[in-house]
Amino acid sequence: MTDEPVPVGRRTDLGFAKLMPDIDRDGAWLLTLDGTPQSYVDLADPTHLEFEYTRRLGHLADALAPAGQPLDVLHLGGGALTLPRYLAATRPGSRQRVVEVDGPLLELVAEHLPWPGPDPDGAGIAATVGDARVALSELPSGSRDLVIADVFHGSRTPAHLTSVEFVRLAAAALREGGCYAANLADGPPLAFARAQAATVRAVFPYVCLVAEASVLRGRRYGNVLLAGSTAPLPAAELARLFAGDIFPARLVEGEDLAALVGRAAPVTDADATDSPPPPDGAFSVG
């Protein structure tokens, strides 16, 4: 008889992290930081994406290249490495680097939820501790197919990762036709999301925004996905995937995105601020 998995917790650089087993799904774990959900990982089936925002990032990655084709990916923000594990399973041979600022958090995840490291050819997942922007600035130009920014200090995206200067660093790291994707969160009146869309539009000629209809209408707080590229994004395929998901979402691009942005100006380092805090109880769990 095997021991049942039990929750584990540890004080990290950014708060108190807790790994809790999902009693309804063998091999699945929830990572929280100060009570705010950060990641959900299924060790038995890494293609299972529980959270709505990870499913949207998964759909985006699925649509960017033919099925199974390896990608060179930089993940800014690690958590429990949900998306890196997904891509390792769906696109074997991908070279992935994860940058997580919270070293003790990364150690906790490595100890209890280990992942496949890189092989001699560099395929696999390499995780390092560091600041996302510093790591991005040190990358060789044109070295990545996909850059994913999913950085939350607790429940807020740090200001220095929200500016035109930051997005330009991401653009420089991408190969021609590569994609930059940012997972953000905002609520009524969507001032932060509009400004972030304006920021990505100032750098990339092709941009789309994805969110639940209720979030787009300014009725509630929720996740917002922004994607930018130098090449046309597969918008029709993505719109179909997002609309048909168990967490349906709308894709906004072109003139509709311009109308949503309105007069919002791109954010610069000089005026950047952290993303707005969620309303009380928006994401907290025990």
Residue ranges and their predicted role:
Residues 2-23, 38-44, 217-286:
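SAM/dcSAM-binding transferase cores
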Residues 24, 103, 132, 212-214:
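Residues that form or immediately flank small-molecule/cofactor binding pockets and catalytic motifs
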